[in-house]
């Protein structure tokens, strides 16, 4: 049947979850799409984008770039963006387009790091799953990339998963930190909502 769509993106798909995790980590976030997915993320799924500085961009893929898999053009665009913006890392978030053409995310990550000298993450999301799947993949990649060995710090707790998609607000870290402080924790870290990349590097110090 011509025009039959077997898979439709949910209202808050996995790429939105990935962007929500990375929003406050001072990274250069690239949505690997033609333009529509990035607009939905910034316009509807990420309320912090309106009040804080977060470098979220669309890759602006054209038809032939996607069909032919011209990753070198994407890397060139990212390199030019890095000349104008300061970022602690670069993250490329997948959408249905790279899922259909079979983008090699591992190779893309290496190409970006070689071009820019900045750590790069690639998140293999495809736009057909719910936001929590994208969050899970992103947390995993983030901790694999940046967390280092640390001695455990008694009384320290790390909160994973605090995003506006989960809590419906953008100031929930105050409530969460107060709650766990009342439970007896002396150091409460809320990754990605109030606490940045340094907290991720020290994640192993949590009890």
Regions found by a protein language model. Give the residues of each.
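An N-terminal assembly and electron-transfer interface module characteristic of large anaerobic redox
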Residues: 1-207
């Amino acid at each position: 049947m011509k025009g039959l769509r077997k898979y439709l993106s949910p209202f808050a798909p996995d790429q939105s979850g990935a962007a929500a995790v990375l929003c406050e980590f001072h990274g250069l976030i690239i949505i690997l799409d033609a333009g529509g997915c990035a607009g939905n993320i910034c316009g509807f799924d990420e309320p912090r984008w309106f009040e804080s500085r977060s470098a979220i961009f669309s890759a602006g893929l054209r038809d032939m770039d996607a069909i032919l898999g011209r990753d070198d053009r994407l890397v060139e665009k990212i390199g030019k963006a890095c000349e104008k913006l300061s970022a602690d890392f670069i993250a490329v978030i997948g959408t249905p387009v790279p899922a259909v053409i079979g983008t090699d995310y591992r190779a893309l990550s290496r190409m970006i790091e070689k071009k820019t000298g900045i750590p790069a993450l690639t998140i293999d999301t495809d736009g057909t799953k719910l936001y929590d799947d994208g969050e899970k993949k992103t947390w995993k990649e983030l901790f694999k990339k940046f967390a280092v060995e640390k001695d455990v710090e008694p009384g320290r707790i790390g909160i994973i998963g605090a995003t506006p998609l989960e809590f419906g607000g953008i100031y929930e870290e105050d409530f969460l930190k107060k709650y766990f402080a009342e439970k007896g924790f002396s150091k409460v870290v809320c990754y990605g909502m109030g606490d940045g990349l340094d907290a991720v590097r020290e994640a192993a110090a949590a009890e």
